[in-house]
């Protein structure tokens, strides 16, 4: 059971991790996202 849930979970987490990591990094560096940041994230 653990193995079955671990496989799909990792795949989904990895996909979300990329988006979350980018947003978290930008948020930590810039408390207020600028228009350029939003545009870059939208294009991402």
From Swiss-Prot:
UniProt keyword Acetylation, yes or no: yes
InterPro entries: Beta-thymosin, Beta-thymosin_sf
Disordered: region residues: 1-44
Cellular-component GO terms for this entry: cytoplasm; cytoskeleton
Pfam entry (one): Thymosin
Family of this protein: Belongs to the thymosin beta family.
Function: Plays an important role in the organization of the cytoskeleton. Binds to and sequesters actin monomers (G actin) and therefore inhibits actin polymerization. May be involved in the regulation of structural plasticity in the CNS.
Protein name (database record): Thymosin beta
